[in-house]
Amino acid sequence: MSSNKVTITEVAKHAGVSVTTVSMVLGNKGRISPDTIEKVNASVEALGYIRNRAAANLRSNSSEIIGLILKDISDPYDAEVTAGLSEEIEQQGYMLFLAQCGDSQEKFEHCVLTMARQGVGGIAFCSIGENQQLNVD
């Protein structure tokens, strides 16, 4: 994999459009003609452009990631819930960020804080320990 990342400016130049237009096409925002969308997408493909989702999430103050904290990922129930949740949220355009905390309150809190710092759109809990609780300060 090349260390020379293709920039949005290069995509815009290749497609013959503005950087703003490329950004709008990539974000599915605004009213862009089908021909322009096709040109931008062709340039993205031709140049191998990969959108930096972390940067886009910072700009939009949103995330396409949902966190799921489990007690034990090897538990059949947890595995089934994970599979079902993953399938459902992917249909909504989200991806799953999975963490396992066991019975440790400290690890549970660490998982929640890590997910929050990563900017997840939400956090779900499944089969966490009965004594685990979230202390929000």
UniProtKB/Swiss-Prot annotation:
Residues 6-60 form the HTH lacI-type domain. The keyword Transcription regulation applies. PROSITE patterns: HTH_LACI_1, HTH_LACI_2. CDD domains: HTH_LacI. Keywords: DNA-binding, Repressor, Transcription, Transcription regulation. Residues 8-27 bind DNA. InterPro entries: HTH_LacI, Lambda_DNA-bd_dom_sf, Peripla_BP/Lac1_sug-bd_dom, Peripla_BP_I. Transmembrane segments: none annotated. One of its GO terms (molecular function) is DNA-binding transcription factor activity. It comes from the Bacteria. Repressor for the malX and malY genes. PANTHER family: HTH-TYPE TRANSCRIPTIONAL REPRESSOR PURR-RELATED (PTHR30146:SF148), LACI-RELATED TRANSCRIPTIONAL REPRESSOR (PTHR30146). This is Maltose regulon regulatory protein MalI. The lineage of its organism: Bacteria, Pseudomonadati, Pseudomonadota, Gammaproteobacteria, Vibrionales. The gene is malI.
